[in-house]
């Protein structure tokens, strides 16, 4: 991933990577590998935004309102795990993760576990 990309290009790649991950076919080894790479790419992109575009955090946080391909969930995790954030942004990101944790799909359990670990670390 090139570090000299514009903020807009990075966010576009982030959203495309979320789509790739969302569309994983777990019966297809190549699809899983591609999806895992997309997840790694999103983490790298979040790190690049944090490093090179820290003034764009508010703009990045608007992804918390985009549930398409679970972009909101990815952004919430990356804001809390990688970026510097305000208490209000922390609350917004946590509410996104809590919403997914309350569902009855395969991502809910992972998000419930993540929230438990997060809360334990915050004590």
What spans do the regions from the language model cover?
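Short inter-helical turns and helix N-cap capping residues of alpha-solenoid HEAT/ARM repeat scaffolds
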Residues: 67-68, 103-105
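Mid-chain, well-packed structural core segment of small domains
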Residues: 61-90
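Residue-level detector of extended alpha-helical repeat arrays and alpha-solenoid scaffolds
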Residues: 35, 39-42, 72-73, 108
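Residue-level signature of the C-terminal ends
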Residues: 48-52, 82, 118-121
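Residue-level signature of alpha-solenoid helical repeat scaffolds
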Residues: 12, 77-78, 113, 117
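Short terminal alpha-helical segments
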Residues: 3-40
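Amphipathic alpha-helical scaffolding segments comprising HEAT/armadillo-like alpha-solenoid repeats
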Residues: 11, 53-63, 87-98, 123
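Amphipathic alpha-helical repeat scaffolds
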Residues: 15, 46, 61-64, 77, ...
